[in-house]
Swiss-Prot record:
The keyword Secreted does not apply. Regulatory photoreceptor which exists in two forms that are reversibly interconvertible by light: the Pr form that absorbs maximally in the red region of the spectrum and the Pfr form that absorbs maximally in the far-red region. Photoconversion of Pr to Pfr induces an array of morphogenic responses, whereas reconversion of Pfr to Pr cancels the induction of those responses. Pfr controls the expression of a number of nuclear genes including those encoding the small subunit of ribulose-bisphosphate carboxylase, chlorophyll A/B binding protein, protochlorophyllide reductase, rRNA, etc. Residues 900-1119 form the Histidine kinase domain. Residues 689-745 form the PAC domain. The lineage of its organism: Eukaryota, Viridiplantae, Streptophyta, Embryophyta, Tracheophyta. Transmembrane segments: none annotated. Signal peptide: none annotated. GO terms for molecular function: phosphorelay sensor kinase activity; photoreceptor activity; protein homodimerization activity. This is Phytochrome A-2. Pfam families: GAF, HATPase_c, HisKA, PAS, PAS_2, PHY. SUPFAM superfamilies: ATPase domain of HSP90 chaperone/DNA topoisomerase II/histidine kinase, GAF domain-like, PYP-like sensor domain (PAS domain).
Length: 1123
């Protein structure tokens, strides 16, 4: 896939490319499936994938009828696996609207008895489900069907009325109906006596604890641990972790097997092996089990009167499609269990607002279990596996974020070094020194074309081939300043075959019209190794069969002309270097002078920065000393060098006595090890949060006992980033701990404490062993707005705390999973630490707090539920967070309003452009044609301004100018037309005093930006000219010869106006000396920055009775001046 990429990256463009790739692959999947169905046993896997794979190039397959039929077949299949049965109910009447053919036998027949009408109820369309099960079972089903988050109640244990057989009922909703899968409870299995997610979570407690105990920083270790835990939990012969790469192909990155099985670790397989439709289903139904791929499927019969086809996407019984079943059989995998690993999409728009809770998700990979014999895993264990996969996904997400941070840090470091090289030896330092451009991104080679010379590094095409690529880019991608592709062949480069396998992928950025930087990559297959790829002697050629070895061979064939795809952050890094080089190339001749000026300016900034730093430091010290929360600090030796008024007040130890004492001598003996560990980690730069310890009291405070603190450690660093001490910001939780200690000492009646309205009693809620709410104290009612009677006997996970219709809505799915983990730990008797927790109260306010969970024991010491304690932030912190959220919301509202206005302006602008084009097709006079040309220039200027979404990039000088030929006459006429209405209203006369020889000169530059600048300065001049006054535009143009045919044009325009002139405050804003307080100030600053991009500037001169803007810019002459 080739991509001609604009110079600025965007998450939306990344998502749209993925979307387009997914649609293209879905069409390839559809054609493969159609070929498979037509070919039957003669299906040739390898050749079919290769033929279909050729579509994944420039000519992407279209979304046709074959694709639509295939997607319908995948989502609306009417077959299930025979290990259970299925009923579909009308949600309003609870009557059967569809059933599997084996349902009557499984649910209504009496074992070893001849069926008759009298001894069992009939099952068919319209049957009332309550007639099929015992009264308690029917009641349990009825309750579950009325539950909003019904998935959280699965599985529901029910018993058939006729046979008494136990089944797990697994319920989910689809449009207009409820689907119930019935799975028999095996004789050897101890059935779960109560529904609820917490019951299933208990089964994965050990695995979750192991995952959470892993140190971060190794994706390999995380995946190896996951497959090991799933292997032990489920008992399958093989467990693998798949990862999907950016081009959608898959790789086995972790594996564990029973002895004697062929290893698949390192296997790569084409994207088509797991179709896009299947990936979509994995996003919806995150655990998928196939008990026996050879088993005969069972048909589902539905009411013919139904106006829609039932979808079985969410059914646990959904039968595998024929091609997948054959693939499994070919690799001797009879049974499988698959868990989806769903993570946050990294290309999000950085939204951290609590009002926007849901992030875009993507399928990162799968955890796949295979067995060589039929294998059934009960639903409770599968539910536990799903929960484990969610916890695993959270850790994968953290590892991905950590990897990106490390990569970005390395790129920034390399960019800084390259920038330094450019400053010292522009531009050849980036290829002649170390590090060089190859160190910026992962590549096999790089090249630079500068002043018609070629410099090469690493594995690259020959010099003549590089020149040919540069010519091809200028011919076929001239509108793009950047280009990237993982296959030069697919991108259309004519001589791609001559490059061979050595160079397949390329990225390039154009610094100037003729100067280009290239990066090259070899084919992907060069980096791929798999132990299972070897063909064993005596084996028949299996290239035609669907098998991992065939998949690997096909994958290598597909990627032999492709490199690893270029990632978004790599393209961004190249673009940043492009901007650095663009400025460096302009300034090469005067580099020494610029370097001195920059160094002088940096020295000035350092002096100013130190003064500001001292002022800020003094203010921070004052805030720490007067803070209402305890704050203390120590040096690298652990000696106290900071002790604020609050902690002195709590401990009774004055500041003077605390200073110089070792911290470990001030804490209780029971907390020494914990504080020592926290201190050592902080001195290494690892900052722990929410650490609880006790500190001694002194003097008059000794009788009240030690103070309990929850502390966040923060490493103090010097200007060289060395750790020089540790600062501890604490919360006093003594009152809460006293309550909890007193609570734990009481055996039996706890209501006197929990239900006490004393403000010292924290918010407390609790659940029984099945996850139903059994406690909700007055403080909790006050905090959430929900009364005790409204929440009692509701499911804590889902009904009270959840992501959709819950009473207290959580921010996202990750928060929901983390809450489940904490409750699960306490329920299994493990000690839990305080964790950050947040939810939306009834009034919509977002509450942030710390959650502490304690197990509840009966007289025999068995866990009968949990108690949850919430610790709220101090009022000062809550106020600060509230102000921060308000500021973010205000900024977001303004941004939304601006986006709305820009979008609404475009529609009428398109109408104006259409009207103008229609007029151009009519008979017009010379003057009318000139007016239309002026109108067109104004419209183009407006469109360009509407595209300026990032003012900071303009202010910082990171804007690409669009160069083209133009005459100054066009610019002057268009600019003047924009201010004529204003000048006529004030009776101001505008005089164009620019010589005709100058205005008719053909120049080369960005005419629309020059037009924007001139119009802005004209408007400001008219605004500050008295009524009846005069504004005069004059200009000069000088040329310098840079070569035989190239002339540099220095243009200077003056705008002179009468009156007292532009206010000094507004001019200060133009020069960036004051904050941007007005629209005129922003306009002037942007205009000046645009002139600076044209190697120009603006001056403002005052004389008696008149003032003038002097605008300068450097352009190029398209041809020599006449005369």
């Amino acid at each position: 896939m080739s991509t001609s990429r604009p110079s600025q990256s965007s998450s939306n463009s990344g998502r749209s490319r993925r979307s387009a790739r997914a649609m293209a692959l879905a069409t390839v999947d559809a054609k493969l499936h159609a070929t498979f169905e037509e070919s039957g046993s003669s299906f040739d896997y390898s050749s079919s994938v290769r033929i279909s794979g050729t579509a994944d190039g420039v000519n992407q397959p279209r979304h046709d009828k074959v694709t639509t039929a295939y997607l319908h077949h995948m989502q609306k299949g009417k077959m299930i696996q025979p290990f259970g049965c299925l009923l579909a109910l009308d949600e309003k009447t609870c009557k059967v609207i569809a059933y599997s053919e084996n349902a009557p036998e499984m649910l209504t027949m009496v074992s070893h008895a001849v069926p008759s009408v009298g001894d069992h109820p009939a099952l068919g369309i319209g049957t009332d489900i309550k007639t099929l099960f015992t009264a308690p079972s029917a009641s349990a089903l009825q309750k579950a069907l009325g539950f909003a988050e019904v998935l959280l109640l699965n599985p529901v244990l029910i018993h058939c009325k006729t046979s008494g057989k136990p089944f797990y009922a697994i319920i989910h909703r689809v449009t207009g109906s409820m689907i119930i899968d019935f799975e028999p409870v095996k004789p050897y299995e101890v059935p779960m006596t109560a529904a609820g997610a917490l019951q299933s979570y208990k089964l994965a407690a050990k695995a979750i604890t192991r995952l959470q105990s892993l140190p971060s920083g190794s994706m390999e270790r995380l995946c190896d641990t996951m497959v090991q835990e799933v292997f032990e939990l489920t008992g399958y012969d093989r467990v693998m972790a798949y990862k999907f790469h950016e081009d959608d192909h898959g790789e086995v990155i972790a594996e564990i097997t029973k002895p004697g099985l062929e290893p698949y670790l390192g296997l790569h397989y084409p994207a088509t092996d797991i179709p896009q439709a299947s990936r979509f289903l994995f996003m919806k139904n995150k655990v998928r089990m196939i008990v026996d791929c050879h088993a005969k499927h069972v048909r589902v019969l539905q009411d013919e009167k139904l106006p829609f086809d039932l979808t079985l996407c969410g059914s646990t019984l959904r039968a595998p499609h024929s091609c997948h079943a054959q693939y499994m059989a070919n690799m001797d995998s009879i049974a499988s269990l698959v868990m989806a690993v769903v993570v946050n999409d990294n290309e999000e728009d950085g939204d951290t607002d609590a009002i926007q809770p849901q992030k875009r998700k993507r399928l990162w990979g799968l955890v796949v279990c295979h067995n060589t014999t039929p294998r059934f895993v009960p639903f409770p264990l599968r539910y536990a596996c799903e929960f484990l996969a969610q916890v695993f996904a959270i850790h994968v997400n953290k590892e991905i974020e950590l990897e990106y941070q490390i990569i970005e840090k390395n790129i920034l470091r390399t960019q800084t070094l390259l920038c330094d090289l450019v400053m010292r030896d522009a531009p050849l330092g980036i290829v002649s020194e170390s590090p060089n451009i190859m160190d910026l991104v992962k590549c096999d080679g790089a090249a630079l074309i500068y002043k018609n010379k070629v410099w090469r590094l690493g594995v690259t095409p020959s010099e003549s081939q590089i020149r040919e690529i540069a010519f091809w880019l200028s011919e076929y991608h001239m509108d793009s300043t950047g280009f990237s592709t993982d296959s030069l062949s697919d991108a259309g480069f004519p001589s791609a075959l001559s490059l061979g396998d050595v160079v397949c992928g390329m990225a390039a950025v154009r610094v100037t019209a003729k100067d280009v930087v290239f990066w090259f990559r070899s084919h992907t297959a060069a980096e791929i190794r798999w132990g299972g790829a070897k063909h064993e002697a005596g084996e028949k050629d299996d290239g035609r069969r669907m098998h991992p070895r065939s998949s690997f061979k096909v994958f290598l064939d597909v990627v032999k002309a492709r490199s690893l795809p270029w990632k978004e952050y790599e393209i961004d890094a190249m673009h940043s270097l492009q901007l650095i080089l663009r400025n460096a190339f302009k300034d090469t001749e005067s580099m020494d002078l610029n370097t001195k000026a920059i160094n002088t300016r940096l020295s000035d900034l350092k002096i100013e920065g130190m003064q500001e730093l001292e002022a800020v430091t003094s203010e921070i010290v004052r805030l720490i000393e007067t803070a209402t929360v305890p704050i203390l600090a120590v040096d690298v030796d652990g000696l106290v060098n900071g002790w604020n008024i609050k902690i002195a007040e709590l401990t009774g130890l004055p500041v003077g006595e605390a200073m110089g004492k070792h911290l470990l001598t001030l804490v209780e003996d029971s907390s020494t090890d914990r504080v020592k560990k926290m201190l050592n980690l902080a001195l290494l730069g690892e900052e722990e949060k929410n650490v609880q310890f006790e500190i001694k009291t002194h003097g008059s405070k000794m009788d009240s006992g030690p103070i309990s603190l929850v502390v966040n450690a923060c490493a103090s660093r010097d200007l060289r980033d060395n750790v020089v001490g540790v600062c501890f910001v604490a919360h006093d939780i003594t009152a809460q701990k006293n309550v909890m200690d007193k609570f734990t000492r009481i055996e039996g009646d706890y209501k006197a404490i929990v239900q006490n309205r004393n403000p010292l009693i924290p918010p407390i809620f609790g659940t029984d062993e099945f996850g139903w709410c059994c406690e909700w104290n007055p403080a909790m009612t006050k905090l959430t707005g929900w009364k005790r009677e409204e929440v009692m006997d509701k499911m804590l996970l889902g009904e009270l705390f959840g992501t959709h219709m819950a009473a207290c809505r959580l921010k996202n799915q990750e928060a929901f999973v983390n809450l489940g983990v904490v409750l699960n730990k306490a329920m299994t008797g493990l000690e839990t630490e305080k964790v950050p927790f947040g939810f939306f109260a009834r009034n919509g306010k977002y509450v942030e707090c710390l959650l502490s969970v304690s197990k509840k024991l009966d007289v025999e010491g068995l866990v009968t539920g949990v108690f949850c304690f919430l610790q709220l932030a101090s009022p000062e912190l809550q106020q600060a967070l509230h102000i921060q959220r308000l500021s973010e919301q205000t900024a977001l509202k303004r941004l939304n309003a601006l986006s709305y206005m820009k979008r609404q302006i475009r529609n009428p602008l398109c109408g104006i452009i259409f009207s103008r084009k229609m007029l151009e097709g009519t008979a017009l006079g010379t003057e009318q044609k000139q007016l239309l040309r002026t109108s067109a220039q104004c419209q183009q200027q407006l469109s360009k301004i509407l595209d300026d979404s990032d003012l900071d990039s303009i202010i910082d000088g990171y804007l690409d100018l669009e160069m083209a030929e133009f005459t100054l006459h066009e610019v002057l006429v268009t600019s003047l037309s924009q201010v004529m209405t204003k000048s006529n209203g004030k009776s101001i006369r505008i005089v164009n005093d620019v010589a005709e020889q100058i205005v008719m000169e053909t120049l080369y530059g960005d005419s629309l930006r020059l037009q924007q600048v001139l119009a802005d300065f004209l408007l400001i001049s008219i605004n500050f000219t008295p009524n009846g006054g005069q504004v005069v535009v004059a200009g000069t143009l000088t040329k310098e010869q840079l070569g035989k045919s190239v002339h540099l044009v220095k243009l200077e325009l003056s705008i002179t106006h009468g009156g007292s002139g532009v206010p000094e405050a507004l001019l200060n804003q133009m020069f960036g000396n004051n904050g941007l307080e007005s629209e005129e100030g922003i306009s002037l600053l942007i205009s000046r920055k645009l002139l600076k991009l044209m190697n120009g500037d603006v001056r403002y001169l005052r004389e008696a009775g008149k003032s003038a803007f002097i605008l300068s810019a450097e352009l190029a002459a398209a041809h020599n001046l006449k005369g």
